[in-house]
From Swiss-Prot:
Function (record text): Functions in the N-end rule pathway of protein degradation where it conjugates Leu, Phe and, less efficiently, Met from aminoacyl-tRNAs to the N-termini of proteins containing an N-terminal arginine or lysine.
Broad enzyme group: transferase
Coiled-coil boundaries: none
Chief place of localization: cytoplasm
Gene Ontology CC: cytoplasm
TM region positions: none
Protein name: Leucyl/phenylalanyl-tRNA--protein transferase
Gene name per UniProt: aat
Compartment(s) of residence: Cytoplasm
C-alpha cells in the first residue's frame, strides 16, 4: 500500500509512481528529461478548436474521478498493459477524497467519453493520465485543464514523460535541474484547483 504522506512527499521531490505492468510492483520515477506544457504558449489544434466551438462535450470536474482513473487504467488498442495498478488507483482515489487529485471529464449525452486526472499542489498540476472513448474527448478535457490552470495562475503543468501525443498537445522537455527549479517556485504558491 502506498502511504499518502510518502506519495505527496515524493511529488515535492520530483518523483512519481508507476507500476510494472507484469507484476504490479510500484516503483518511483524521476526522469532526467521531464515533459511539461508551457501554459502561456498553449494553443488548441484547429480540430479541437472546432469541437470546442460546436460544444459537443459537457465538461465536468471531479464528478466521476473513479470512472476517469478506471478509463485511464483500461487496456488500449495500441497497448494492453497499464502502469496504473490497483494500489496506485486506491492511492489516487484517496487523494481525490482529500481534494488533492482531480479529474477533468468530457461527457456526451450523459456518458463519460474521456478525461484526465492529476494532482494539484501549490501552483503545480501533475498530469497523470488521460483516456477517450469518443474522438477528441481527452483533448477537450486537456484544453479545459490548461484554461483552468491559466485562469487560476498555475505555473507548472507537469506531463511527466514525453510521448508523441503530449508533443502534439504542446509539451516540451526540460532537464531535471530546470524542472526542480520550476517545481520549487510552483510549490511555494497557494492556489486552489476548485
Amino acid at each position: 500500500m502506498i502511504r499518502i504522506d510518502e506519495l505527496l512527499r515524493a511529488y515535492r521531490k520530483g518523483l512519481f509512481p508507476m507500476a510494472d505492468p507484469d507484476d504490479e510492483k510500484v516503483y518511483w520515477c524521476q526522469p532526467y528529461k521531464r515533459a511539461v506544457v508551457p501554459l502561456l504558449s498553449y494553443m488548441p489544434s484547429r480540430d479541437v478548436a472546432r469541437i470546442l466551438r460546436r460544444g459537443e462535450f459537457e465538461v465536468r470536474i471531479d464528478s466521476d474521478f473513479e470512472g476517469v482513473i478506471r478509463g485511464c487504467a483500461a487496456p488500449r488498442k495500441s497497448d494492453s498493459q497499464t502502469w496504473i495498478s490497483p494500489e496506485i488507483m486506491d492511492a489516487y482515489l484517496t487523494l481525490n477524497q482529500l481534494g488533492v487529485a482531480h479529474s477533468v471529464e468530457c461527457w456526451h449525452h450523459g456518458e463519460l467519453s474521456g478525461g484526465l486526472y492529476g494532482l494539484s499542489m501549490g501552483a503545480a498540476f501533475f498530469g497523470e493520465s488521460m483516456f477517450f472513448r469518443r474522438s477528441y474527448a481527452s483533448q477537450v478535457a486537456f484544453d479545459h485543464l490548461v484554461r483552468r490552470l491559466k485562469d487560476r495562475g498555475y505555473l507548472l503543468l507537469d506531463a511527466q514523460i514525453m510521448n508523441p501525443h503530449l508533443q502534439k498537445l504542446g509539451a516540451v522537455e526540460i532537464d531535471h535541474d530546470e524542472y526542480m527549479l520550476q517545481l520549487d517556485i510552483a510549490l511555494g504558491k497557494k492556489i486552489r484547483f476548485i
